[in-house]
UniProtKB/Swiss-Prot annotation:
Biological process, per Gene Ontology: L-arginine biosynthetic process
Protein's UniProt name: N-acetyl-gamma-glutamyl-phosphate reductase
Record-linked NCBIfam families: argC
Pfam families tied to this protein: Semialdhyde_dh, Semialdhyde_dhC_1
Alphabetized UniProt keyword annotations: Amino-acid biosynthesis, Arginine biosynthesis, Cytoplasm, NADP, Oxidoreductase
EC code: 1.2.1.38
Location in or out of the cell: Cytoplasm
Annotated GO CC locations: cytoplasm
Molecular function in Gene Ontology: N-acetyl-gamma-glutamyl-phosphate reductase activity; NAD binding; NADP+ binding
Active site: residue positions: C160
Length: 357
């Protein structure tokens, strides 16, 4: 495989959806290249036998995730692994000088204790003693943590729901324009958000022609959203978050409801707030008043489409966001973080125009 000095990227968990999307985005990237393919189940196999639909130069072999081998050929590592696995590999890579972007939830919480509570199922088989590493990891939302990401050794890429929900919400928390109580998030995602491992709820016969809520109380992403929201707002926040599974492969739509502190603010005023915050962020597009985002518009892109409306009758602010859950919600955001870490423009090599229809 061709490599670029200073931009060699190992992809661990290469055959999962996150890994596949990462590899696809790195193909043809002007400053980064794939240097190592890691995967336990497919170790020893040629890439063409694992993913014939995504050919790579020289048809490399998939290898076990040996830290020494990864460090010998890589500057960065993207870990696209189930929760509870990245925390075992990341410290070994960091010790060897490899900078890590983790797509799982293992380092998203500042507090290890909170992670152990939220991810109790995974934590039961682990003996994590890396509280200091958790607190030092940078939350990988580039539009909000860009400088910290650029200098980071370990970046924890946000979940897809937190990304879509926080992007429109944070500007209004930062400016103190909304009440911090009573925030409600209603989000809908496609089946690819469940990953590539077979699950009954994701079967065509189960998911097709049906929309269903899940994780209605205590979904894991609730506390992740609250953590970042509290950091920006500077005060305690408890919000309501309900995700829904919809019968499509990819895409995520989040609608956020909050009460304005100034009922005189208009949709035009609130749109200006978003435009001012995201003016210099090419991976965000703020739509004009009255135009509401559709998931198809963001499909196959690393762009977040944002829109806002004000209900003068109720005093409610309605924020809308559409992303591709596998790109801006996962792999694309990971590459966006590596771009910053490598000293590149954040949007380098990332698709910003959708395939439509």
């Amino acid at each position: 495989m061709a490599t670029v000095k200073g931009g060699r990227v190992a992809v661990i968990g290469a055959s999962g959806y996150g890994g596949l999307q990462t590899i696809r985005l790195l193909q043809g990237h002007p400053g980064l290249s794939v240097s190592f393919l890691g995967g336990e189940r497919s170790a020893g196999q040629r890439w063409s036998s694992v993913c014939s639909f995504l050919p790579l130069p020289d048809d490399p072999k998939v290898e076990s995730a040996d830290p020494d081998r990864i460090a010998a050929c890589s500057d960065f590592a993207v870990l696209s692994l189930p929760n509870g696995l990245a925390c075992q590999l990341a410290p070994q890579l960091l010790e060897r000088g490899v900078r890590v972007v983790d797509l799982s939830a293992d380092f998203r919480y500042r507090s290890l204790e909170q992670w152990l509570q939220v991810y109790a199922k995974e934590a039961g088989s682990l003996n994590r003693q890396d509280a200091e590493l958790c607190s030092s990891a940078v939350y990988g939302l580039p539009e909000w943590n860009g400088p910290a990401i650029a200098d980071a050794k370990l970046v924890a890429a946000p979940g897809c729901f937190p990304t879509a929900s926080l992007m429109p919400l944070l500007p209004f928390l930062k400016q103190g324009l909304i009440e911090t109580s009573g925030i409600i998030i209603d989000a809908k995602t496609g089946t690819s958000g469940g990953g590539r491992v077979p699950k009954e709820a994701m079967l065509l016969a189960e998911a097709s022609e049906s929309i269903a809520p899940y994780g209605v109380i205590g979904h894991r992403h609730t506390s992740e959203i609250e953590q970042m929201a509290m950091e920006v707002a500077g005060q305690d926040i408890r919000l309501q978050f309900t995700p829904h599974l919809v019968p499509m492969v990819r895409g995520l739509l989040s609608t956020v409801y909050a009460r304005l502190r100034d009922p005189g603010l208009t949709a035009e005023d609130c749109t200006t707030v978003l435009e001012a915050i995201y003016r210099h962020h090419p991976c965000v597009q703020v739509l004009p008043v009255g135009t509401y985002p559709a998931t198809k518009w963001a499909r196959h892109t690393n762009r977040a489409l944002l829109s806002v409306q004000v209900d003068t009758r109720t005093g409610q602010l309605v924020l809308m966001s559409a992303i591709d859950n596998l790109i801006k919600g996962q792999a694309g955001q990971g590459v966006q973080c590596i771009n910053l870490m490598a000293g590149l423009a954040p949007e380098t090599g990332l698709p910003l125009q959708s395939f439509y229809p």
